[in-house]
Amino acid sequence: TCALPIFYSWVKVHALLPMWALYILSDILYVLVYKVVRYRVKVVRQNMKASFPDKSDTELRRLEREFYHHFADYVVETIKLAHISLEELQRRAFLKNPELVDTLMEKGHTCFILLMGHYGNWEWFSGSTSRFKDSRIYQIYRPLNNQAFDRLFFNLRTKFGSFGIKKQDTVRDVITLKKDKTRCVVILDRKSVV
């Protein structure tokens, strides 16, 4: 449809903004999403109560506000992936002790799984392709229902040379990588677990 090129152009223009400007937009987005539109507030509230049954209502509301601030930051940071250099990305999102993986690979291990939580912006880890010697980076992902967003996220996640594996293909593809002795690091978050 003609809306897709407009949407992609909007993302690319916003990605040109410096991070400080994007974080101002994030603060505006926080107000719109949390206070005005109230996007999934009931669901977030239920999840918070279920996850933290011992916390007071005051503490739960504080966590709820923090969640929406993080969500707004996540949106603008992910948009920035469309126009960020590898050097800047690696300054902002880094892996502690990547040499541990290198050491194990030198001992003959070929495939590693990195399980990442939803802390910070794990989309930014796509720039990790150059952090592991002679290894390919694979990201397990769940295709999104909206094709425009799915295509956008796939392109952003693979921009720096990593490869995407659909969740439903994980077992088959990882077994193939292991059989072929491909030096690989597989990244997934808790929702991608098969």
Q: Predicted regions: what is each one?
A:
Residues 1-4:
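Short, small-residue-biased leader/transition segments that mark boundaries at the very start
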Residues 28-108:
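N-terminal signal-anchor transmembrane helix
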Residues 9, 44-47, 125, 152-153:
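Hydrophobic alpha-helical segments typical of transmembrane helices
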Residues 79-194:
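Soluble catalytic domains of membrane acyltransferases
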Residues 7-12, 23-31:
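Dinucleotide-binding Rossmann-like beta1-alpha1 core, especially the glycine-rich loop
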